[in-house]
Amino acid sequence: MGERGELVSDLHPSDDHDADPRLAPLLAWRQQLVDSGAVAPRSFKEAHLRLVLRSGRTDVEQIRAMLPGSVAEHAEEMARILAELTPAAPEPDPPPVPEPQPEPEPGPGKHRSPETDEPPVATTTEIPIPTTGFAPFQFSSQQVALHDITVQRTDAAVELSWPPYEAPDDEAARDISVVMYRVVSSDDQAPYSPDPAHLVALTEEPKATDERQQVSPVRHYQVWVNVGASEAAARKAQPVLYATAVLVRPVTGFEIREDAGWVIGQWTAPPGVTAVHVFRVPIDEVDRDEAQYRILTAGENLAGFVDTEPVRGQRYRYRARCAVNVDGVVRLSEAAEADVELAAALMPVTDLVVETAADGASCDLSWTPPAGGQVAIYRSQNGPSAGAEAIELPQGALEQVGLTPELRVTQDLTEETGSDGRRRARLTGVTWPSEWSRAYFTPVTLMGERAMLGRTLSSVRTGTIRDIELAEYCNKQVLTFDWPDGAASVIVYLAPKGHDPRSGLNGRSFEISLEEYERYGGMHLTGQLPVGGCSLHLAPVAFAGGRRVVGAFSSIEYRGLLRLQYAVRIGRDPNGFPTTATIALRAEQNVPGSPGFVLVNNPQRLPLSVHDGHPVDVAPLDARGQLADHPSKELRWSALTTSGDGELWAANLSGLQGWIRLFVNIGSPAQLRVIALLDPPVETLRLTAATL
């Protein structure tokens, strides 16, 4: 303690340095750095400014060595301020160098005390620092340790060790018979040299023990090496920073316990610790990097934690490490740790999903596996007894609720990870007896001799839609089919021609119930189907457990229908006999070109077909109403339009009587089926004079 007392006395001399006029400007400069965010208040303290003023050092590198690492970059600016604040008093002449041989002048950045009996004129004289028999440390460039000190805390002390010293290549020729390790420590801030720090040990072995109790949150350890041909030479040599370590004080009163599936930790964090990092490590992975298992990162956890997300039935090792920011780097203490094994709880499956296949003959089941136990799926025709869900039962009581061993599904189970990162168990292609129209699936969690039923879901198997017919009328279509067994309704999707429903259906759809189907004799589609045709895909719809279940699809093609409508205006002579007829045609949609048409005359009745009478001579008219071409037996428009006023044809009715009617002149019955030619009012097709 005597040496330690001398050290404290030397570092804090009795003279009042608050009287130093340079302190106030330096404090203002420090505050500017803090306010701008360039340095942290805890990294650059007023004590550092006082230490530099007491030392009397003004060289940049000397000041840099005395500042913390995160502040060292501002040493040049501090030296400039000191130079500006130093009074411009004349310096005394340096004393003569003693003979016969002067010692070498110190290089740039070295400090040398004046060798004179008279005190220097400047007021910033160097205050000698006790060195325990070693030469005072001379500041040069900032030193960086080559090695780390291995620190091991025991119940009574801290054990320190480091690699044995090896001379660098440029000193291999020197005699370094003596290697002295000076192990020093300092709380809160790293010492800038071994002189002002607490001497832990002076040893020739690469190890030491520190028996002092740590009371500050951070303790810095340094190993400085003095080497020489003898002990005296080694003590006179300048020390070299060889190894360093930072020891963060751990938590105390560490306690861990489980409470109903949660894990609760309690401790006391030392003063000055900013946060405690908590890790939950699976017991099988305790040797892996623990950083990935850190939890509760949003809180400081200074007094403990509550972990609400451990998995029941698992065993974990919980670790707590105090965290302190040291020169911009987060340092962690050694871990306080304990193992916790959470008791497995019997939990029901509540998110069973049943997906019926497109053919309706099978289904896929999926669910989230519970934390403990295994899940068995039971398939039944009527489901388990009411009130058995989420109740713990002996496995032997499953038969009493209707779940007998032969109802258990024995297919292989697979597991997959969903897009949200959660595990899902899956059974694919599960079928049930063909005579069942409905099947109930019940998940049962089994653990030891205990069982718990989860949520039961059902799947419905509807009949296949057959005998589909689409009847075409002039202004609508009527869809008929055999109503499928077990269906509450039938849905019809429209899709392009040739579309495979297995590729997905997202177009227009229509749905009809059994009551509506029987009332109207089918599904009536008025103006709903495209003129160019489409495919219709029908599927039965049923409901199971509030879920909508769509059965297998059946399809039919609709070729489409082009609706045309013509108008006839008959011209007559003064006696009322027909002479000419003007014919106009319009389409339901614009079509380039047109098929051939024939105007047929039958003197007895309205013509029934293109062959029921005689064709009438026709010719197109130009814009002035004159014949634009020679007469022919066939009409053919250049384009069919929705307006019908773009092109007119004229017919020669001289000497004709009875009736006329326009027909599509196409030989292919298949093509005829996609064109509907609508007649005008019958009276407009009659040639007989109105007076007759």
Swiss-Prot record:
Start-end of Basic and acidic residues biased regions: 1-21
Biased composition (Pro residues): 89-107
Name the UniProt record assigns to this protein: Putative ESX-1 scaffolding and assembly protein SaeA
Disulfide bonds, paired cysteine numbers: none
Residue spans crossing the bilayer: none
Source organism phylogeny: Bacteria, Bacillati, Actinomycetota, Actinomycetes, Mycobacteriales
Description of the deletion phenotype: Loss of DNA conjugation when disrupted in recipient strain (MKD8), no effect when disrupted in donor strain (mc(2)155). The recipient strain does not secrete EsxB.
UniProt-annotated stretches for the region Disordered: 1-23, 87-134
The encoding gene: saeA
Summary of the function given for this chain in its UniProt record: May be involved in assembly of the ESX-1 / type VII specialized secretion system (T7SS), which exports several proteins including EsxA and EsxB. Involved in DNA conjugation in recipient (MKD8) but not donor (mc(2)155) strain.
